[in-house]
Protein backbone atom coordinates (compact mmCIF):
# COMPACT_ATOMS: atom_id res chain seq x y z
CA UNK A 1 0.00 0.00 0.00
CA UNK A 2 1.32 3.45 -0.88
CA UNK A 3 2.34 6.00 1.71
CA UNK A 4 -0.41 8.31 2.96
CA UNK A 5 -0.59 11.49 0.87
CA UNK A 6 -2.01 14.77 2.17
CA UNK A 7 -3.09 15.76 -1.35
CA UNK A 8 -5.08 12.56 -1.84
CA UNK A 9 -6.90 12.62 1.45
CA UNK A 10 -10.39 13.90 2.21
CA UNK A 11 -10.61 16.98 4.40
CA UNK A 12 -11.69 16.69 8.01
CA UNK A 13 -14.14 18.67 10.14
CA UNK A 14 -12.44 19.86 13.33
CA UNK A 15 -15.21 20.71 15.80
CA UNK A 16 -14.24 22.67 18.91
CA UNK A 17 -16.69 23.39 21.75
CA UNK A 18 -16.37 24.79 25.25
CA UNK A 19 -18.15 26.82 27.88
CA UNK A 20 -17.64 30.56 27.54
CA UNK A 21 -14.31 31.60 29.06
CA UNK A 22 -12.48 28.30 28.61
CA UNK A 23 -10.20 29.73 25.91
CA UNK A 24 -11.69 28.17 22.79
CA UNK A 25 -11.71 31.40 20.78
CA UNK A 26 -8.03 32.08 21.40
CA UNK A 27 -7.08 28.51 20.55
CA UNK A 28 -9.05 28.42 17.30
CA UNK A 29 -7.86 31.88 16.24
CA UNK A 30 -4.25 30.78 16.74
CA UNK A 31 -4.91 27.57 14.82
CA UNK A 32 -6.26 29.46 11.82
CA UNK A 33 -3.28 31.82 11.92
CA UNK A 34 -0.61 29.12 12.10
CA UNK A 35 -2.05 26.17 10.18
CA UNK A 36 -2.50 25.95 6.43
CA UNK A 37 -5.29 24.19 4.55
CA UNK A 38 -7.95 24.89 7.19
CA UNK A 39 -10.73 27.48 7.18
CA UNK A 40 -13.41 28.53 9.62
CA UNK A 41 -16.88 27.45 8.58
CA UNK A 42 -18.98 30.58 8.03
CA UNK A 43 -22.56 30.28 9.23
CA UNK A 44 -25.68 31.81 7.75
CA UNK A 45 -27.88 33.89 10.03
CA UNK A 46 -31.15 35.77 9.85
CA UNK A 47 -30.13 38.41 12.39
CA UNK A 48 -29.25 41.93 11.33
CA UNK A 49 -25.64 42.68 10.47
CA UNK A 50 -23.77 44.74 13.05
CA UNK A 51 -21.80 47.78 11.83
CA UNK A 52 -18.46 46.06 12.44
CA UNK A 53 -19.42 42.86 10.62
CA UNK A 54 -18.70 41.96 7.00
CA UNK A 55 -21.08 39.77 5.03
CA UNK A 56 -19.30 36.59 3.98
CA UNK A 57 -16.55 37.04 6.57
CA UNK A 58 -18.29 36.96 9.93
CA UNK A 59 -21.59 35.48 8.70
CA UNK A 60 -23.64 35.14 5.56
CA UNK A 61 -26.60 37.39 6.35
CA UNK A 62 -29.81 36.14 4.74
CA UNK A 63 -33.56 36.68 5.04
CA UNK A 64 -35.79 34.23 6.89
CA UNK A 65 -37.47 32.81 3.74
CA UNK A 66 -34.06 31.88 2.32
CA UNK A 67 -33.02 30.32 5.62
CA UNK A 68 -36.24 28.31 5.78
CA UNK A 69 -35.74 27.06 2.23
CA UNK A 70 -32.17 25.98 3.02
CA UNK A 71 -33.24 24.23 6.21
CA UNK A 72 -36.24 22.43 4.73
CA UNK A 73 -34.32 21.49 1.58
CA UNK A 74 -31.47 19.81 3.46
CA UNK A 75 -29.08 22.65 2.74
CA UNK A 76 -27.95 23.01 6.36
CA UNK A 77 -25.77 20.57 8.28
CA UNK A 78 -26.94 22.04 11.58
CA UNK A 79 -29.06 24.96 12.72
CA UNK A 80 -30.43 26.60 15.83
CA UNK A 81 -32.66 29.47 16.86
CA UNK A 82 -31.13 31.84 19.42
CA UNK A 83 -33.02 34.85 20.81
CA UNK A 84 -35.38 34.86 17.85
CA UNK A 85 -32.63 34.68 15.22
CA UNK A 86 -31.66 31.59 13.24
CA UNK A 87 -28.12 30.35 12.61
CA UNK A 88 -26.95 27.43 10.50
CA UNK A 89 -24.04 25.75 8.72
CA UNK A 90 -24.44 25.57 4.92
CA UNK A 91 -23.91 22.07 3.58
CA UNK A 92 -22.51 22.73 0.08
CA UNK A 93 -19.36 24.73 1.00
CA UNK A 94 -18.38 22.16 3.61
CA UNK A 95 -18.88 19.17 1.32
CA UNK A 96 -16.96 20.89 -1.49
CA UNK A 97 -14.06 21.75 0.82
CA UNK A 98 -13.80 18.22 2.21
CA UNK A 99 -13.91 16.68 -1.26
CA UNK A 100 -11.02 18.96 -2.27
CA UNK A 101 -8.94 17.83 0.73
CA UNK A 102 -9.45 21.10 2.64
CA UNK A 103 -10.13 21.01 6.38
CA UNK A 104 -12.94 22.97 8.04
CA UNK A 105 -13.00 24.35 11.58
CA UNK A 106 -16.28 24.60 13.49
CA UNK A 107 -16.75 26.75 16.59
CA UNK A 108 -20.13 25.47 17.79
CA UNK A 109 -21.87 24.23 20.93
CA UNK A 110 -22.74 20.67 21.91
CA UNK A 111 -26.17 20.87 20.29
CA UNK A 112 -24.69 21.87 16.94
CA UNK A 113 -22.08 19.15 17.33
CA UNK A 114 -24.81 16.54 17.75
CA UNK A 115 -26.42 17.64 14.50
CA UNK A 116 -23.08 17.52 12.68
CA UNK A 117 -22.56 13.99 14.02
CA UNK A 118 -25.89 12.95 12.51
CA UNK A 119 -24.96 14.45 9.15
CA UNK A 120 -21.25 13.62 8.69
CA UNK A 121 -19.87 11.75 11.70
CA UNK A 122 -17.17 9.94 9.73
CA UNK A 123 -15.53 13.26 8.79
CA UNK A 124 -15.50 14.79 12.28
CA UNK A 125 -12.76 15.11 14.88
CA UNK A 126 -14.29 16.78 17.93
CA UNK A 127 -12.61 18.54 20.85
CA UNK A 128 -14.15 19.84 24.07
CA UNK A 129 -12.12 22.52 25.86
CA UNK A 130 -12.37 22.70 29.65
CA UNK A 131 -11.14 25.33 32.11
CA UNK A 132 -8.71 24.10 34.78
CA UNK A 133 -11.19 24.91 37.57
CA UNK A 134 -14.52 26.59 38.26
CA UNK A 135 -12.74 29.44 40.03
CA UNK A 136 -10.46 30.03 37.05
CA UNK A 137 -13.41 30.06 34.66
CA UNK A 138 -15.11 32.74 36.76
CA UNK A 139 -11.87 34.74 36.90
CA UNK A 140 -11.44 34.60 33.13
CA UNK A 141 -14.99 35.77 32.51
CA UNK A 142 -14.52 38.67 34.93
CA UNK A 143 -11.12 39.56 33.49
CA UNK A 144 -12.59 40.05 30.02
CA UNK A 145 -14.58 43.00 31.39
CA UNK A 146 -17.11 42.58 28.61
CA UNK A 147 -20.16 41.39 30.51
CA UNK A 148 -22.24 42.47 33.47
CA UNK A 149 -22.32 40.43 36.67
CA UNK A 150 -25.70 39.00 35.67
CA UNK A 151 -24.41 37.82 32.31
CA UNK A 152 -21.32 36.28 33.91
CA UNK A 153 -23.56 34.42 36.36
CA UNK A 154 -25.68 33.16 33.46
CA UNK A 155 -22.59 31.99 31.58
CA UNK A 156 -21.44 30.07 34.65
CA UNK A 157 -24.85 28.42 34.98
CA UNK A 158 -24.81 27.52 31.29
CA UNK A 159 -21.35 26.00 31.73
CA UNK A 160 -22.82 23.35 34.02
CA UNK A 161 -25.02 21.94 31.26
CA UNK A 162 -22.39 22.42 28.56
CA UNK A 163 -19.66 20.57 30.46
CA UNK A 164 -22.06 17.69 31.15
CA UNK A 165 -21.74 16.76 27.45
CA UNK A 166 -17.95 16.31 27.46
CA UNK A 167 -18.27 12.54 26.96
CA UNK A 168 -19.76 13.10 23.50
CA UNK A 169 -16.43 14.40 22.16
CA UNK A 170 -13.46 12.54 20.71
CA UNK A 171 -10.94 14.58 22.72
CA UNK A 172 -11.06 16.63 25.91
CA UNK A 173 -8.52 19.38 26.43
CA UNK A 174 -7.99 21.00 29.85
CA UNK A 175 -6.80 24.50 29.05
CA UNK A 176 -4.57 25.25 32.03
CA UNK A 177 -1.66 26.47 29.88
CA UNK A 178 -2.38 28.17 26.54
CA UNK A 179 0.84 27.16 24.77
CA UNK A 180 0.56 23.54 25.85
CA UNK A 181 -3.14 23.41 24.98
CA UNK A 182 -2.46 24.89 21.55
CA UNK A 183 0.26 22.33 20.89
CA UNK A 184 -2.18 19.57 21.84
CA UNK A 185 -4.86 20.97 19.53
CA UNK A 186 -2.40 21.09 16.63
CA UNK A 187 -1.43 17.48 17.32
CA UNK A 188 -5.10 16.45 17.31
CA UNK A 189 -5.48 18.12 13.91
CA UNK A 190 -2.33 16.42 12.59
CA UNK A 191 -3.53 13.02 13.80
CA UNK A 192 -6.92 13.54 12.15
CA UNK A 193 -5.26 14.48 8.87
CA UNK A 194 -3.01 11.43 8.97
CA UNK A 195 -5.93 9.08 9.62
CA UNK A 196 -7.88 10.65 6.77
CA UNK A 197 -4.94 10.12 4.41
CA UNK A 198 -4.61 6.52 5.57
CA UNK A 199 -8.31 5.93 4.88
CA UNK A 200 -7.89 7.34 1.37
CA UNK A 201 -5.00 4.97 0.66
CA UNK A 202 -6.89 2.06 2.20
CA UNK A 203 -9.96 2.79 0.08
CA UNK A 204 -7.82 2.66 -3.08
CA UNK A 205 -6.21 -0.58 -1.94
CA UNK A 206 -9.55 -2.23 -1.15
CA UNK A 207 -11.08 -1.11 -4.45
CA UNK A 208 -8.21 -2.75 -6.35
CA UNK A 209 -8.38 -5.83 -4.15
CA UNK A 210 -12.09 -6.30 -4.83
CA UNK A 211 -11.62 -5.75 -8.56
CA UNK A 212 -8.91 -8.41 -8.66
CA UNK A 213 -11.00 -10.82 -6.58
CA UNK A 214 -14.01 -10.42 -8.88
CA UNK A 215 -11.80 -11.09 -11.89
CA UNK A 216 -10.21 -14.16 -10.32
CA UNK A 217 -13.51 -15.53 -9.00
CA UNK A 218 -15.33 -15.10 -12.33
Identify the function of each model-found stretch:
Residues 2-4, 146-147, 161-218:
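NTP-dependent small-molecule kinase module
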